[in-house]
Amino acid sequence: MNEILKKSYVELKDSLNSGKISSTELVSACINRIREVDGAVKAFLYLDEKKVLNSAEESDKRRKEGKPLSEFDGMPVAIKDNICIRDTITSCSSKILENYKSPFHATVVEKLLEKGFILFPRTNMDEFAMGSSTENSAFQTTRNPFDLERIPGGSSGGSAAAVAASMVPLALGSDTGGSVRQPASLCGLYGLKPTYGTVSRYGLVAYASSLDQIGPFSRELQGCIDLYSVISGKDVRDSTSIHRPKFSASDVQPQDFKGLKVGVIKMTPEIQSEVVKSYDKVLNQLKEKGATLVDLDFSKFGFAIPIYYIIATAECSSNLSRFDGIRFGSRKDKTGKLEDLFVDSRTEGFGPEVKRRILLGTFSLSAGYYDAYYGTAQKARALIRKEYESFFSKVDCILQPTSPTTAFKIGEKTKDPIQMYKADIWTTSVNLAGLPAMSVPMGADQKGLPIGLQITTPHFQEGKLFGIALALSTLEGMNIQFPESIK
């Protein structure tokens, strides 16, 4: 691996700003690393090498003239395949959109380009962001760089794997029920799901509009802080965007463990023993450093997954109705009949998991069942929000494992969707409540597979969230040894 890519994100940023390395050198190193390892990892669906090199050369020219767009000018960032980039295919890893080129930039893309970031599209994902393993892509299965026989998590598995394998220092994904945090956990990364409404969804292909949020990946906390500071902010093109003071890195609130009230949960027998061991080790260190641990009763959250899947699939059924082979999506016109065109285009264009969720969502919204399922789920969602409000009247943050297990083997759970859904047991409730949460590295199991710790704070308290993450990074056993050689 090129020596440049052995540098931390902060070192890379400092080297770009001091002139020790050029963007062209950094981008070339990323391209060579992708050539070297992505045949095995399969994080990227496509990369226009000429385009990214041209962008790097333009960045170097700006710096040479003393006119960099920002301190991030020339920094590579990978983009998930459901975030629109003008004149670039945005397929959502689905056959129905395999040739769709977006006519516009997503707001987050515009913000990145304004700061001079070098975009590396497109990373693989579960089709339309529906999955927890990136096995649901119509094109390829992404593998975990720590063990190529295992999944990287999902649905943003391509973005997570690209960062974990040192192909790029930063990446963007989307999180509907854990799709940034869970792959971050399984790939040893920092991954942020921001407060709902703080990052524009304009240009993000919608799965479940009331749950989706774009979030960053990085090996280092500072990478997530910097990306969030760039992509957050009010956007008039997104009606769910919230007007708040612009976040900056200076808003990070350093946290002292002494006096910090930390909400914790009880582990259950189905949780992998090494996950429990790592979690207990963190809690013991927190007690030693003066934190107050408060046991929280999460029994009411046992229904979070069914609530999530009723709401998410209902919104998915509505959002994906536009992909009919006429307005959007590839057309399969075999008989010349309009109804057959709809049926054939969607039958051939959507994969099994997407079809399953469309059917479930359509049923939940159907006459006679709407109140019993969707209406009841929304009422239960409100109760989850109130439960979190009650928790945060007692604690400053909640700590729990991000995932109940480390990365499982490819194909292990594909035939049992319920077991796959349970991988999101601790992440979905955060989306239902619209809260900010982050997965941070919490060491590894005996096989060297990463374990993640989820931090949750009240709405709009990303500054505190980052401060707690920074403090946690100083604890013993939190670091991850990333693989240089991937075979």
UniProtKB/Swiss-Prot annotation:
Keywords in alphabetical order: ATP-binding, Ligase, Nucleotide-binding, Protein biosynthesis
Role noted for this protein: Allows the formation of correctly charged Gln-tRNA(Gln) through the transamidation of misacylated Glu-tRNA(Gln) in organisms which lack glutaminyl-tRNA synthetase. The reaction takes place in the presence of glutamine and ATP through an activated gamma-phospho-Glu-tRNA(Gln).
PROSITE patterns the UniProt entry points to: AMIDASES (PS00571)
InterPro entries noted in UniProt: Amidase, Amidase_CS, Amidase_dom, AS_sf, GatA
Protein name: Glutamyl-tRNA(Gln) amidotransferase subunit A
Active site (record annotation): K80, S155, S179
A Gene Ontology term for the protein's cellular component: glutamyl-tRNA(Gln) amidotransferase complex
A UniProt-annotated Pfam family: Amidase
Transmembrane portions of the chain: none
Catalytic reactions of this protein: L-glutamyl-tRNA(Gln) + L-glutamine + ATP + H2O = L-glutaminyl-tRNA(Gln) + L-glutamate + ADP + phosphate + H(+)
EC numbers on record: 6.3.5.7
Subunit structure: Heterotrimer of A, B and C subunits.
Organism of derivation: Leptospira interrogans serogroup Icterohaemorrhagiae serovar Lai (strain 56601)
Molecular function per GO: ATP binding; glutaminyl-tRNA synthase (glutamine-hydrolyzing) activity
Any Gene Ontology biological process: translation
Family: Belongs to the amidase family. GatA subfamily.
